[in-house]
Amino acid sequence: LGKMGIPAHAISRTGYFSTQEIQVLLNYLAILDNPRQDIPLASVLTSWFGGLGEEELGYLRAVDKEKPFYENVLAWMSESEEISESISEELRQKLPEEIQEKLARFHQTYQKLRKKSRYLPIHELLYEIFAMTGYLDYVTALPAGGQRRANVEMLIEKAIAFENSSYRGLFHFIRYIEKLQKYDVDFGEAEIVSENDEAVRIMSIHKSKGLEFPICFVA
């Protein structure tokens, strides 16, 4: 329908956590809490945040195959604002300069955000991520950008609701999301179509009970 220029919206109670824009954002939050995680770290580095391609990621992995992937990355992400002086010249020569520059840019933003993550409420941390990386503008510019943006903004709402409970902090929020995923407690994607919008609404027969439509296709 989208390819034909027909506005359409699928109503679902699942699929929120599997959307790319949310997966990447949750992975970024995860490594802000703890960067020693190979899969979330690789996901973030090959996303808008890191800008690395798969081949470049392979170069980074090959720097020292005896160590976990995250250790190779952390060698370039010391607590200082500059790239760690402990990196040997041999390691520098193994990694192309373009990759080093991308890691340096990623490292600079990451370190600032990680410091903020220690005291900011989650929803404010998300706003900081968007302001410093342009992530919200990026997802909005993608195909189906309106839906993607609404999904990201929905995560802010979830963060605010979480902070109104008895728990606080990034660590607890990540554990909360992980528990939802573990027990298959998912959300549908954010609603961006109102009842008065002219668009095709895709839903189950059960969901359509009690509603009236001038035209209906059953498939």
Across the structure, where does each feature detected by a protein language model lie?
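Accessory alpha-helical DNA-binding modules that contact the DNA backbone or grooves
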Residues: 63-90, 103-106
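Conserved motor-region signature of P-loop NTPase helicases/translocases
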Residues: 1-63, 94, 100-101, 108, ...
